[in-house]
C-alpha cells in the first residue's frame, strides 16, 4: 500500500468511520475519556491494518461526528458529492483569485502606461514651451537690435564726421597760422622797405617825404588777405557747427525713440 499523508489518512478515517457506523446502533453521549480511547483505537487500526473495523468505537465516533458537523451523517455517496462540490468551490475560488490578480495586474499596467503617457506629454509640452520662450526672446532681441544698430550707425557716423571736422579745423587752424605768419613776414619786409625809403628820403630831401604815405598805405594792403581767410574759415566753422547740432538732434530723437520702444517691450 502506498504511504499516505496525515491529511489523507484523517479524511480516509472519517469516511471509513461514517461507512462502518451506518448500521451501528446509537448509544448515549460518551465521555471525553471514552472518545479519546476510541479515537486512539481507531487510529491504531488504521495505522496497523490499513482499515477501520466495525465496532463500538466506530459507532461512537460516528455519533459524535453527526452531532458536531452539519453533513456528518450523510452517506458515502453524498460525502463524495459534497467533496466534489467542495473541490469545485475551491477551484472557483482559485479561479476568482487568479482573475482578481490578473485584473489587478492589468490595472497596474494600465495606470503605469497612463502615467508614462502623461509624463511624455508633460515633457513635450515643456519642450514646446521652452522653444516658444526661446523664439520670443530671439524676436525681442532682434527688435531691440534693430534700433540699437541704427543708433550705433548714427553714432559711428557722428564720430567719423566729428573726426573729419576736427581734422579739418586743425588743418584750417594750421593754414590760418601759416597765413598769419606769412602776413607778418610780409609786414616786416614792408616795414624794412619803408625804413630804407625813409632813409633815402632823408638823404634825398624833403620832396621824398610826400611819397611816404603812399608807401605806408602799401604796407597795410597785405593784411586784407588774412582777414578774408579768417572770415571764410569762420563761415565754414559755423556751417560745421550747424551740421553737428543737426546730427546731435537726430541722435537725440533716435535715443528717445529707442527708449520708448524699450519701455513698451519691457
UniProtKB/Swiss-Prot annotation:
GO cellular component terms, semicolon-separated: extracellular region
Biased composition regions of type Basic and acidic residues, renumbered to the chain: 90-100, 154-188, 204-213, 221-266
Signal peptide: 1-23
Tagged with keyword Secreted: yes
Keyword entries, A-Z: Secreted, Signal
Effect noted on mutating residue 242 to K: Found in patients with Moyamoya disease; uncertain significance
Location of the region described as Disordered in the Swiss-Prot/TrEMBL record: 90-266
Subcellular location: Secreted
Presence of keyword Zinc-finger: no
Tissue/organ expression: Expressed at higher levels in fetal brain and skeletal muscle. Lower expression is detected in fetal kidney, liver, spleen, thymus, heart and lung.
Protein known as: Coiled-coil domain-containing glutamate-rich protein 2
Organism: Homo sapiens (Human)
Gene responsible for this protein: CCER2
Amino acid at each position: 500500500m502506498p504511504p499516505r499523508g496525515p491529511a489523507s489518512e484523517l479524511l480516509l478515517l472519517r469516511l471509513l468511520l461514517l461507512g462502518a457506523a451506518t448500521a451501528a446502533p446509537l448509544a448515549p453521549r460518551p465521555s471525553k475519556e471514552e472518545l479519546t480511547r476510541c479515537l486512539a483505537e481507531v487510529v491504531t487500526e488504521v495505522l496497523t491494518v490499513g482499515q477501520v473495523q466495525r465496532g463500538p468505537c466506530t459507532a461512537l465516533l460516528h455519533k459524535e461526528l453527526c452531532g458536531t458537523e452539519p453533513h456528518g451523517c450523510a452517506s458515502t455517496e453524498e460525502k463524495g458529492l459534497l467533496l466534489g462540490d467542495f473541490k469545485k468551490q475551491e477551484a472557483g475560488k482559485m479561479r476568482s483569485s487568479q482573475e482578481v490578480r490578473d485584473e489587478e495586474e492589468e490595472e497596474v499596467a494600465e495606470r503605469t502606461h497612463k502615467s508614462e503617457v502623461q509624463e511624455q506629454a508633460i515633457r513635450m509640452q515643456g519642450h514646446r514651451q521652452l522653444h516658444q520662450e526661446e523664439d520670443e526672446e530671439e524676436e525681442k532681441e532682434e527688435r531691440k537690435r534693430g534700433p540699437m544698430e541704427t543708433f550705433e550707425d548714427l553714432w559711428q557716423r557722428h564720430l567719423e564726421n566729428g573726426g573729419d571736422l576736427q581734422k579739418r579745423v586743425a588743418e584750417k587752424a594750421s593754414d590760418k597760422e601759416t597765413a598769419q605768419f606769412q602776413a607778418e613776414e610780409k609786414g616786416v619786409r614792408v616795414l624794412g622797405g619803408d625804413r630804407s625809403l625813409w632813409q633815402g628820403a632823408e638823404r634825398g630831401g624833403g620832396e621824398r617825404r610826400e611819397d611816404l604815405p603812399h608807401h605806408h598805405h602799401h604796407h597795410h594792403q597785405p593784411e586784407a588777405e588774412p582777414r578774408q581767410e579768417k572770415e571764410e574759415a569762420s563761415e565754414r566753422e559755423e556751417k560745421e557747427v550747424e551740421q553737428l547740432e543737426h546730427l546731435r538732434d537726430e541722435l537725440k530723437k533716435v535715443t528717445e525713440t529707442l527708449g520708448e520702444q524699450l519701455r513698451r517691450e519691457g
